[in-house]
Amino acid sequence: MRYVIEMIVKALVDDGESVDIREVEQRGATLIEVRVAPNDVGKIIGKQGRTIRALRSLARIGGSKKNRRYLLEIVE
């Protein structure tokens, strides 16, 4: 799941080199932390949060196929 999110995020931002994705285990779920350059945060969130909602939906769907729970957060 990390690889899929990383490829999508790198395609969305201007500075693909600054993208850092980490997976952290938390209370029976896997938290995917996305770090990008400060000027790219708005591109990840999108208009009215549509882009981040879509990314979270992809993570949730991918997790359901593996019987896992994935959460996605943008970390500054």
Question: What is the meaning of each model-derived region?
Answer:
Residues 1-43, 52-76:
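RNA-contacting regions in translation and RNA-metabolism proteins
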